[in-house]
Amino acid sequence: MPPWGWWPLGLLGVAGLDRFLADHQRWGRFRRATLVSIVWLGPSMLWMWDLTPPGYLVAVTAYSAFFGLGAALAPGGRGRPLGLVGAIVLSSALRSAWPFGGVPLSTLALSLAGSPLLPLARLAGPLTLVAAAAVIGVSLSALWDRRWLTVGVGTALIAGACLAAAVAPQGTPVGEIDVALVQGGGEQRTRFTSQGATTVFENHVAATDTIDRSVDMVLWPENVVNVEGEFVEHPWYPELLDLADELDATLIPGVFADLSEDNVNYSLTVSGDGEVLDRYDKVWIVPFGEYVPARWAVEPLAELTGVRDQLPQDARRGDEPAVLETPHGTMGVMISWEVFFAHRARDAVRNGGEILLNPTNGSSYWLTQVQTQQVASSRLRAVETGRWLLQAAPTGFSALIDESGDVLERSAISEQRVIYGTVERRTGWT
C-alpha cells in the first residue's frame, strides 16, 4: 500500500505470500501470486479509476500478472525462499522499466520509505529495499516452520546490509542556502481551463507576495505558468522577471507552453535581478498524460469509445542534463513524474546537482494516493543521492526533505502556504 505508516504489512505480506505459494506447482503459484498482487495493487491504484476505469482494470491486472509470472518461474521446494526473493526483485525491476519506460507506482520500495530500512537505499537504490523486504519476509516464514538455516542466512544478510548502509558515503555539505517553496493552493481533482490557468498563476503570485523574510531561492511548482505560444511573448513573462527582481532572490518557475505542433514542460532559472539564466525541459514525460504510446493504435480505439478528445497532444522531450545553473550553485531538477525514477536523480547528481528540486502538479488526481507516493519517492531519491530535496506542488503535497530522507516540513492538501528552510548544498556520491 502507499506509505501511510503501514510498512510492516509489506514484510508480513511477503511472509504470507511465501506460505501461500508453498506446495504448489507453477500454475498454482501463478494464480495465487497474481491474486495476492490484485489485492495489493487494486486499492493502492484506485486513484486511476477516476481518470480511466478501463485503464485501471488493465493496469492492475497486467502488473499483478508480472508478479504471478515471477512466482511461477521461481523454483519450488527447498529453493523457494531464494527463488521468491529473486522473483520479487525481478518483477519490481520489470515494472520500473517496462512498459512505457516503467510505471513505478504502488511499489514495495515506496511502502518502505517510512521504515527503518530506508538507509539501505543508498547502497543500490530502491531495489535494495525490495530485496531486503523479500529476505525479511521469507525469513519470517521460515521462522514459523523453524527452518533455522534460512532464518540465520536472512538475518545475516539484513545485518550486513544495514552495516554497509551505515558506513557508506552519504555526500558532503559544501554550503547552505535559504529557500522558500510556494504552494498557491486550490481545489484538487480539477481539469485544465484557460480561466483556471489564470487563477493558478494569480494564486502563486499571491502566495509569493506573502514571503516575509530574505531568501536566496524561491521554488514554484510544475506548470503553474500555463500559456499558449512562447512564454517570452506572454504578459506573464515580464511580470515574473519583475517578481524575482522585487524578491531579490532566484525564482524557479514551472512553465507549460502549448505550442502549435507540440507542448513543452520546463523550469527556468530567473535571477534576483530579473534575468533568465537557464532552462531545463522535462525529459521523462508521462505516458497517456504528456504523450500517447502507439498513438496509431490508441486513437482509433479512443474514437470508438468516445474519449478521443481526452488524448493529449504529444509533449516535446528534453535532451539536456537534469540540472539548472543558479547563482547559488547547480540544482538537480526532476519535474513531477521524473522523481519516481532513480536514474533521473543520478543524472542530476552526475551533472553536478547539489540540491534536488521536484516541481510537480498533482491537482488533477482523485484522493491523495499519488501525492503520498510522490513524497515517499522523494525520500528515496534524497537518500540514494545524499541530497536535500525540495518538492513544490500547487495544491499539495509540498515538502522539505533532508539527505537522510526525513520530511522536515510538509504542506496540507489545498492550502496556500510557503515552506521556508535552510538547506545544504552537497556533493559526492552514496
Q: What does each model-identified segment do?
A:
Residues 1-167, 367, 378-381, 393-395, ...:
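Membrane-embedded alpha-helical bundles of multi-pass enzymes
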Residues 169-429:
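Soluble catalytic domains of enzymes that build or remodel membrane lipids, polysaccharides, and related
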